[in-house]
Amino acid sequence: MYLADSRSTGSRGTEAAAVPDTRPGRRPAAVPSTVLALGAVSLITDVSSEMVTAVLPLYVVAGLGLSPLGFGLLDGINNGVGALVRLAGGHLADRGGRRHKVVAGLGYGLSALCKPLLLLAHTLPVLSAVLAVDRTGKGLRTAPRDAMISLATEPAQRGRAFGVHRAMDTTGALLGPLLAFAVLRATVDGYDAVFAVSGCVAVLGVLVLVLFVPRRIDTPADAVRRPPPPEPDRPPALRDAIGLLRLPELRRLTVCAALLGLTTVSDSFLYLLLQREGDLPAHLFPLLPLGTAAFFLLLAVPLGALADRVSRRRLFLAGHGVLLLGYGLVLSPWHGVPAVIAVLVLHGTFYAATDGVLAAATAGVVPARHQGAGQALVGTGQALARFACSLAFGAAWSLWGGRTALAVTAAALAVSAVVSAFVLRGTDEVPATTDEVSA
């Protein structure tokens, strides 16, 4: 999904005028302050979210007695809700005149509200409702946040900018399970204590967003290449958002994101398999996401910068090849703690080579005024596909067992990667114009 950008970007003066946080005659900042502020918000929010994510599978399966099929249904429905809301969030942000912060703030606020409500969720219906609202918040904020990153960064540096943001986000993912582990070990309230602390951290993330992220980002990042065409006075309509799929480059990205999403096992299922195959004690389960997050953090920025210089789509496909190797290790006769660590290394490398890559690629083929909707379209396709994968994998696990279900998924991933390589082979990163969208 990282698409190579080898074109020249014009004179130094043009660059300085187009990119925020720069002065004429000086080299523009590779990572604008807006990206760093959004990274701080994501870091804090991810500490809160990953505290819950780290204990949720065991809480649902061991605490509430839900079967793998039931957990797959719960996980899939929640991802599906977030996917459907994501499109609305991106469109509303664009329609408001690029007021992406307002929509993103609503999303962060909803998620923060849900954390203390988990204290009341001791039955499956209540838990499902709370998680659905939490996913609604995540769906609302994702596209506007990525649109702000795209608009604040010059095209040649988007891979690095998204890499920095994802690295900060992953720092939160790294700290969240550690904090959950510490809370579980230090308190007698167990899961309730984790949910309470998570809610307090989420509120802090909302405060950082309100205080440090600018309300409106006016810089047209695509002006680095050429002056932007005159934009119509009317706000983008919903049909304009759907009409983005007329753009062949965006359509290819969406198709491939969905195709590969259909064969990407959710983290929760993968960690459950690792815990069972590696015979890990239950209290170590929250540490499994830690290994993934650690290598994601180490590699996100260098791989993002590499994608800016080489090819975003090739790096994205290579990342799925790494994931396929991870599936192979889980299915291999090699078990125990070393095998678990090796799988987590590959899993983290997969995320470093793919997460944020899709957003960087999307930003390069969508007009500035449609950034929110463009990010939402591709993200929705991917999330809906992962929703279907969670349902199918949970059913397959219940029918055939976890190992057989993973073997089938791995074979499907290999086929999907080959097809995606063919579809993306001619993809180029040339931003479309508003006229092309409305045509």
Could you say what each language-model-derived stretch is?
Residues 58-63, 175-193, 388-404:
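Transmembrane alpha-helix termini and helix-breaking/packing motifs in multi-pass membrane transporters
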Residues 102-116, 199, 314-329, 410:
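Structural signature of the two symmetry-related core transmembrane helices
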Residues 130-171:
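Cytoplasmic helix-loop-helix junction between adjacent transmembrane helices
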Residues 25-79, 250-288:
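Helix-loop boundary and gating motifs at the non-cytosolic
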Residues 85-98, 184, 298-312, 397:
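Helix-to-loop junctions at the C-terminal end of transmembrane segments
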Residues 5-32, 216-256, 434-439:
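Juxtamembrane intracellular "pre-TM" segments in multi-pass secondary transporters
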Residues 313-357:
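C-terminal transmembrane helical hairpin of 12-TM major facilitator-type secondary transporters
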